Amino acid sequence: MKYVLLKPKLIFLVLLVISCLFSTQSFSENVKSWKEIDRYYKKNNIDVYNLQASEIEKLKSYETIPDNFATLEDVQKKKEIFFLIAYPLIHKNNEDIKQERKIIIDMEKKGSIKDLNSEDLNSLKIITKKYKLEFTLEDKYLYKKLKQRVNVIPVSLALGQAIIESGWGQSRFAIEGNALYGQWTFDQQEGLIPEKRDPDKTHAVKKFDKLEDSVRSYMYNINTHMAYYEFRVIRRITDRIGAMDENVRIKIKLLAAYAEIGKKYVDKLELVFDSNNLSEFDGIN
């Protein structure tokens, strides 16, 4: 029997891709009540509205939303707990994307694709395939194409869409299906059928094993689907200039395709963004 030895960098990349697809994080946790979440953060003196970078390592990633969260009526407490559930998941997935992006940038510094050794070429092929691009040695724009796709989603934007799509984490889809972003599927076995679905519709809302899977799928969708090509182009341009707050506002306007209501969805997202001061979450590094 022959054994193939992989070099350290390639092993790292393979593990990274696998973890992004089938992640079972050690810091993930299941809780039965939202009060457990509340107690943990109070015990550690962590205020989600004044979160410091030094506190990020203390954040917990919850696999599911507690069943009793749907009955929490205190609006301020509901928002606080939701942010404590959603922010760590968004941060974690953005960090995974940053690692992939760094690999691409490091390779680009070495020169053209043809200058890469076999280890780097294999790594580049893995990332290229994952992000639905065609790999050829002659493509001198491949690095540019990859960097346009392999990029983070602003935390404020990801929070805003999760708020709308999951009803602050209290929707049936969020509680029963770990679905924070209302992504559709046409496989009835993979999703939950909306109770008020039009008779001529056949879609369901996709279910996930864990909340983190929902966040990862959402980010992957934004970073690869053709409907968000303009979003990705503008992200590449605006990330180089201007204040973060204004950058996010520009990007919000490019998400009309995310919902059937189009422009009204953008208006709704802008309202959620402003009324909840979501831009504050973009300043945490």
Residue ranges and their predicted role:
Residues L13-L21:
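Bacterial N-terminal signal peptides
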Residues T24-G160, I164, W168-N285:
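Catalytic cores of secreted/periplasmic lytic hydrolases that degrade extracellular macromolecules
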Residues Y3-F12:
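Bacterial N-terminal signal peptides that target proteins for export
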